[in-house]
Amino acid sequence: MELEFQRNGERYNFLKWAQESFQNVRIVPPGAGICHQLNIEQFAQVAMTSTAAGVETPEGENPTVYFDTLVGTDSHTPTANGIGVLGWGVGGIEAEAAALGQPITTLVPKVVGVRLTGELSEGVAAMDVALTFAKMLREKGVVGCFVECFGPGLDSLNATQRTCISNMTPEYGSTCTLFPVDDQTLAYLRLTGRSEQQVALVEQYAKAQGFWNDPQAPERVYSDVVELDLSSVKRSIAGPSRPHDRIFLEQAQERFHEICADRGLDLGKKETVDVNGRACELGHGALAIAAVTSCTTATDPSMMLTAGLVAKKAAEAGLKPKPWVKCILAPGSHATELLLERAGLMDGLRDLGFYTCGFG
């Protein structure tokens, strides 16, 4: 961080000046975490109050309530869709224009509904759902579309699982992957420190606008609908080349051999490489990087805790990574690392060589 400030001191001084000089400007210090993770943890309001001019309503006057919306220069800005905030990634010029008060223009898109039923099987994570979405929606073709999730299966997904699914929107090809507001959303807002007044406002406004997830309400009409039974989702691996080239974990070995055969690779071929003065023999399929990271994984605490538990058990069993494996730990925010610390799981990660290299 010291080097970061040395190299970018002039930029940071300018940003600090901007925060002190203008209303409605908040600057997040470097090293705090990745933008969309901080947004769902701290900044997103879901429902907001102000006058049309963007100035807080004076006491005693009736405020204007409106939905929180978001544009960001990171392609995974749709993470906030998981807690009911409509938003997507834009280019730098569009973002600057929005920051200076100009409107964002967009064509009215097709809205594709994803009807969710059932619930996830034990051991299946939100990332597995996201990879299933990627394959399903890529095959459907949703480029330029809004995707909205609905159906009885919503009740089985908590808010962080939803944000994990929304996070991978760019991999689906859609503009956003929006979830409605419900009790799961409110529980997350409370957990992350939003006031009871704010939580009550979100609930009342979502219900008044028809954005509340009400199982008894008539289903909305969409341009098209695809269905997914969550109980059919299996543990999956992304790749080998693209996220939607999904491989079921149970078929990983078989698919690896098939892919090598398709590419004409000799599985018996070995190469000797020098790793810190030690000769190591590597072949096709050798793991080079073990990364507990990505903004997608860090969005859902249960996946980070799973990684911590695996590391703890591995360390207790005396296991160590091979010398050629680079180990990386990059939580999405300080809150994610604090969760691992308080759960007593950081020691196991460090024993295996997973030290925090940064946040985000």
Predicted regions and their residues:
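Fe-S-dependent hydro-lyases/dehydratases of central metabolism
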Residues: 1-360
